């Protein structure tokens, strides 16, 4: 599979910007429908994890992906993501996101910038790692100073 095809695969599997991830991952029926639709795009030994706070916990399979997200979404009433940029890094695809969410105890939506690295093996998703900061993800792919069409913004 070409590197451009890797980007197309990964981006094509991301939820639309108006999809509430809190609802998607919490609803058993929606989750089962989604996994049936996308299972063939993932390696049987697919793993994922949140890379944060000097620890990494790994989850196995699509049900592990759900468990990881349910853990993350615990305090959130709503949560959605928008892709800002997808960067071709060979067998890995770096996605830069804007995340939007509303905590259960609040009426205000908050916004954050995060990143994920998706690894493709033999034309299927092999691993997904989610990072709370873009800097951490850029370092993980060896691009601390920016890459492709993305250049790290400098603090004022």
Question: What function would you assign to each model-found segment?
Answer:
Residues 1-9, 67-156:
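A beta-strand edge to alpha-helix "cap/lid" segment located at domain peripheries
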Residues 27, 54, 126:
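Generic anion/oxyanion-binding catalytic loop in active/binding sites
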Residues 15, 53, 103-104:
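Positively charged, low-complexity intrinsically disordered regions
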Residues 19, 26-28, 60-61, 73-75, ...:
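A short linear-motif detector with a strong N-terminal bias
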Residues 1-44, 144-156:
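Short, low-complexity N-terminal intrinsically disordered segments enriched in polar/charged residues
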Residues 33-91:
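A solvent-exposed, acidic/Ser-Thr-rich amphipathic alpha-helical stretch
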